[in-house]
């Protein structure tokens, strides 16, 4: 996990301690969550430096964590791999294992 991922997942690293690129994905995750009032917001950065943000998807026929949705956006855009991820939620809990596995898969 990158420092940004750990920070947003509740490791105690503040956004002030991150480099500017990692701070950017934390801000993207936070603003994505706030924009629609979602339970969770996430952002990922691919190995080309492009960023993808998403919020929790909670439809009757489709459920994705914000991190899974952000990874799906990256994959569907042709991202070759991921170098960082951030997750922001109301309770400061860490992302579930399936969501983290999606990051590692790419």
Language-model features: locations:
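Short, glycine-rich nucleotide/cofactor-binding loops
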Residues: 56-63, 91
């Amino acid at each position: 996990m990158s420092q940004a991922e750990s920070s947003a997942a509740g490791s105690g690293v503040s956004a002030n301690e991150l480099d500017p690129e990692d701070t950017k994905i934390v801000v993207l995750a936070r603003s994505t969550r706030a924009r629609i009032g979602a339970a969770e917001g996430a952002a990922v950065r691919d190995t080309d430096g492009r960023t993808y943000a998403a919020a929790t998807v909670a439809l009757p026929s489709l459920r994705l964590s914000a991190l899974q949705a952000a990874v799906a956006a990256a994959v569907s855009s042709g991202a070759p791999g991921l170098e960082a991820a951030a997750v922001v939620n109301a309770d400061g809990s860490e992302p579930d294992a399936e969501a983290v596995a999606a990051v590692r898969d790419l």
